[in-house]
């Protein structure tokens, strides 16, 4: 079983092979997702909402992410493991270096940061020091209070151009992957076509190189609000591993995301 690396994902992109990602927070679920063939696992700060019961991701700490990264690492043999850098853990280059090191030592293969031009120095610094970076644009949940809620981004021409420009700049700074969240499908397609690095979408249409969902949404166990872009695969399959397999297959076949999961 060959391990998935950022180079593997670049090959998938060049071959037009769609890949899948899921969040994971413990060894058992991570092992199930990994063994079924999920390519990327994210220890996401989404744990603040789906595990800890908060209304947003802001209370999550580096220690929280590091603990769950160690747990997930023990269940993973094949998938690329990304750890989220939580709110205010990368506000300065010095903080970024210290906290990214902690997450890599916990078992991550890559760290993920949210933001655009202001992050370029930190992305370059991490990359030059051997820490791979996944960038995140569009609806960045750590900025929810700036946005005034969980709202679609990039619908007007100026913001769409800004997001595209930031995507190109982050790639130039050394980012190896990019997540785009809750942006119009045409913008996500333009970004995917403009970059050589793989682009992973969530609520961003079917034209990105890969798709990511929160595991609780895929399994229909989220409490409260269910995002429009998600799909409950457990409901249609009745078994966790079958649900994961259905998600992988539908992404590979271009069935998911469908129009009802996409923003115009």
UniProtKB/Swiss-Prot annotation:
Reactions this protein catalyses: 3-methyl-2-oxobutanoate + (6R)-5,10-methylene-5,6,7,8-tetrahydrofolate + H2O = 2-dehydropantoate + (6S)-5,6,7,8-tetrahydrofolate
Keywords on this record? Cytoplasm, Magnesium, Metal-binding, Pantothenate biosynthesis, Transferase
Task: Write down the required cofactor(s).
Answer: Mg(2+)
Q: What is its EC number?
A: 2.1.2.11
Cite the record's note on assembly. Homodecamer; pentamer of dimers.
Compartments reported by the entry: Cytoplasm
Q: Kindly give the InterPro entries that the UniProt entry links to this protein.
A: Pantoate_hydroxy_MeTrfase (IPR003700), Pyrv/PenolPyrv_kinase-like_dom (IPR015813), Pyrv_kinase-like_dom_sf (IPR040442)
Q: Name the pathway.
A: Cofactor biosynthesis; (R)-pantothenate biosynthesis; (R)-pantoate from 3-methyl-2-oxobutanoate: step 1/2
Q: Where is the active site?
A: 181
Q: What is this protein called?
A: 3-methyl-2-oxobutanoate hydroxymethyltransferase
Job description of the protein: Catalyzes the reversible reaction in which hydroxymethyl group from 5,10-methylenetetrahydrofolate is transferred onto alpha-ketoisovalerate to form ketopantoate.
Where along this sequence does the record place binding of 3-methyl-2-oxobutanoate? 45-46, 84, 112
Coiled-coil regions, chain positions: none
Q: Does the keyword Transferase apply?
A: yes
Q: Which residues are recorded as binding Mg(2+)?
A: 45, 84, 114
Please tell me one Gene Ontology term that the record gives under cellular component: cytoplasm
By sequence similarity, the record places it as follows: Belongs to the PanB family.
Gene this chain is encoded by:
panB
Query: What are the GO MF terms of this UniProt record?
Result: 3-methyl-2-oxobutanoate hydroxymethyltransferase activity; magnesium ion binding
- Its chief place of residence is cytoplasm
Upper lineage ranks?
Answer: Bacteria, Pseudomonadati, Pseudomonadota, Gammaproteobacteria, Alteromonadales
Q: Which HAMAP family match?
A: PanB
Q: How is the cofactor bound?
A: Binds 1 Mg(2+) ion per subunit.
List, alphabetically, the Pfam families matched.
Pantoate_transf (PF02548)
Instruction: Output the superkingdom of the source species.
Output: Bacteria
| A biological process term (GO) from this entry | pantothenate biosynthetic process
């Amino acid at each position: 079983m060959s391990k998935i690396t950022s180079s593997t994902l670049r090959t998938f992109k060049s071959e037009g092979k769609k890949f899948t990602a899921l969040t994971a927070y413990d060894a058992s679920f991570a092992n199930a997702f990994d063994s079924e063939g999920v390519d990327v696992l994210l220890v996401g700060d989404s744990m603040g909402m789906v595990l800890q019961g908060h209304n947003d991701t802001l209370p999550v700490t580096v220690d929280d992410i590091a603990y769950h990264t160690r747990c997930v690492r023990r269940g993973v043999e094949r998938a690329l493991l990304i750890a989220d850098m939580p709110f205010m853990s990368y506000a300065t280059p010095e903080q970024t270096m210290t906290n990214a090191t902690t997450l890599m030592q916990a078992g991550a293969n890559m760290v993920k940061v949210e933001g655009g031009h202001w992050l370029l120095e930190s992305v370059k610094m991490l990359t030059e020091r051997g820490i791979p970076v996944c960038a995140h644009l569009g609806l960045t949940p750590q900025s929810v209070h700036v946005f005034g809620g969980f709202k679609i981004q990039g619908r007007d021409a100026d913001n769409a151009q800004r997001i595209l420009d930031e995507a190109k700049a982050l790639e130039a700074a050394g980012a190896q992957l990019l997540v785009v969240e809750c942006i119009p499908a045409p913008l996500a397609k333009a970004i995917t076509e403009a970059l050589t690095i793989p682009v992973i979408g969530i609520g961003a249409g079917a034209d990105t190189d890969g798709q990511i969902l929160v595991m609780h949404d895929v399994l229909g166990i989220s409490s409260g609000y269910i995002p429009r872009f998600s799909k409950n695969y457990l409901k249609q399959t009745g078994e966790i591993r079958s649900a994961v397999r259905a998600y992988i297959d539908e992404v590979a076949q271009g069935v998911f995301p469908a129009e009802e999961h996409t923003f115009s």
